[in-house]
Amino acid sequence: MTASTDAIDSVLLDIEGTTIPVAFVHQVLFPYARAAMPGLLAQRADDPAVRAAVADIAALAPGVPPLDQLNAWMDRDEKIGPLKALQGLAWEEGYRTGALRATLYPDVVPALRRWRAAGLRLAVYSSGSEAAQRLIYGHTTDGDVAGLFSGFYDLRIGGKRAAGSYRAILAETGWAAGRTLFLSDITAELDAAEEAGLRTCQLVRPEDGTVAGDRHPVATTLDDVARRFALPVAA
């Protein structure tokens, strides 16, 4: 657990299990992308983004049909770049047509709006592609809230369990490690962020069945986070 007492002025947030229920990701987003994948590969084969992802798949799994490899990765919930890119394209179509709309935890948008109004800087770091992150926050049941964030970071900056990834985000944003709070439900990610000097807090959402660790502060809502770290709270 970090010992810094500097005031927090920047917050880096995970998505799944932190701002959005795990059930939405696994019961809505993932099945939608799996069902859409055959058509996406067939109908958009000439799309540069699809071609690039297919080339990456061939490099990672030579001789394996792209759809077979994608299904294998999805079965294992792998965080692989070309899979995330193609899932993002599938979700883009779903959000565009209105078939998808993200449901955030009810405490999220009010808390983030309070923090932004108070001058805090907010950014997202998720294994989902930057495009997918923007789609989620741009199409929520609370409306388009993507503008609350100044940055969206994905696996291109590095894996979420590597301290170097958090150092890279700090270098790109210019944020001070001791004044930056990272929120996630995954202990290994929090460990990496802490190694990079960030403050940390584990979100343990009761509806997700997250198991609390013993190395980081724990909160069940963003309001709990605010109280623990002296951030703006509801009146």
Swiss-Prot record:
Keyword Ligase: no
Required co-factors: Mg(2+)
EC number per UniProt: 3.1.3.77
Keywords assigned by UniProt, alphabetized: Amino-acid biosynthesis, Hydrolase, Magnesium, Metal-binding, Methionine biosynthesis
Recorded metabolic or biological pathway in which this protein acts: Amino-acid biosynthesis; L-methionine biosynthesis via salvage pathway; L-methionine from S-methyl-5-thio-alpha-D-ribose 1-phosphate: step 3/6; Amino-acid biosynthesis; L-methionine biosynthesis via salvage pathway; L-methionine from S-methyl-5-thio-alpha-D-ribose 1-phosphate: step 4/6
Gene Ontology MF terms: 2,3-diketo-5-methylthiopentyl-1-phosphate enolase activity; 2-hydroxy-3-keto-5-methylthiopentenyl-1-phosphate phosphatase activity; acireductone synthase activity; magnesium ion binding
Note describing how the cofactor binds: Binds 1 Mg(2+) ion per subunit.
InterPro entries the record matches: Enolase-ppase_E1, HAD-like_sf, HAD_sf
CDD domains listed in its UniProt record: HAD_EP
Pfam families noted in UniProt: Hydrolase
Gene3D superfamilies: 1.10.720.60, HAD superfamily/HAD-like (3.40.50.1000)
Enzyme class per UniProt: hydrolase
Binding partners and assembly: Monomer.
Family: Belongs to the HAD-like hydrolase superfamily. MasA/MtnC family.
PANTHER family found in the cross-reference section: ENOLASE-PHOSPHATASE E1
Function: Bifunctional enzyme that catalyzes the enolization of 2,3-diketo-5-methylthiopentyl-1-phosphate (DK-MTP-1-P) into the intermediate 2-hydroxy-3-keto-5-methylthiopentenyl-1-phosphate (HK-MTPenyl-1-P), which is then dephosphorylated to form the acireductone 1,2-dihydroxy-3-keto-5-methylthiopentene (DHK-MTPene).
Protein name as catalogued: Enolase-phosphatase E1
Originating organism: Gluconacetobacter diazotrophicus (strain ATCC 49037 / DSM 5601 / CCUG 37298 / CIP 103539 / LMG 7603 / PAl5)
